[in-house]
Amino acid sequence: MLKISNYNDLRSSMSPGDVIAFGGKGTFSEIIKWATRAPVSHVGVILQSKLFYDDKSQPGFFNQIIESTSLNGQSGVTITRLSDRIDSYDGEIWLLPLRSDLKQKMDKKKYYDFLIHQERKPYDMPQAIKSALDLIDDAVSPGVLTHNLEDFSRFFCSELVAAA
C-alpha cells in the first residue's frame, strides 16, 4: 500500500486494476473505519484512457477512477479524472497496485466493458451497511440478517471494486 502524497510521483506507475483507497475525515468515513477496524473508508479502481486527436491515438494516457460514492451532487457509480479526485480529497489516499501475476492474466477488454457499463448505477446503501456488519454473520443467525446477495443493479464502493 503506497501512500499518495504527490499524484505526479506515482502517475506513471499506475495501471488498470490498481485500487485507490481513501481514508476520509468525515463522520460517515469515521463510522466506516470504526466498523471495519481499518484506516480505509472508501475504494475505487483505476481506468486508463488513451489520448486521441482527430480520431488518431496520441502518445500518453490519463488515469481515471471509477467508484461508487456521493460526489459533486451525484450518488452512485461515477468516473472522474484521478488527478482531480486526489486534488479535491480531504484525507489520506493510498495506491494498492494489482499483483503483477494478476495483471498478466487480466482480460482488459472484459474489465473495461464491465466497468463502463456500471457508470451511473445508483449507490447501494442497504448492502453497504450490511457489508459492514458481516463480522456478525456467524455469531447471530448465520447470514440471515446481514448476508448480501450478489446484485449488480446498484453498487457500494468495495462491491464495485470486487466485481471488477
Each language-model region and where it sits:
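N-terminal capping segments
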Residues: 2-41, 48, 66-70, 74-164
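Short, conserved beta-turn/loop elements at beta-strand boundaries and strand-helix junctions
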Residues: 49-53
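Short aromatic-glycine-enriched beta-strand elements
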Residues: 59-64
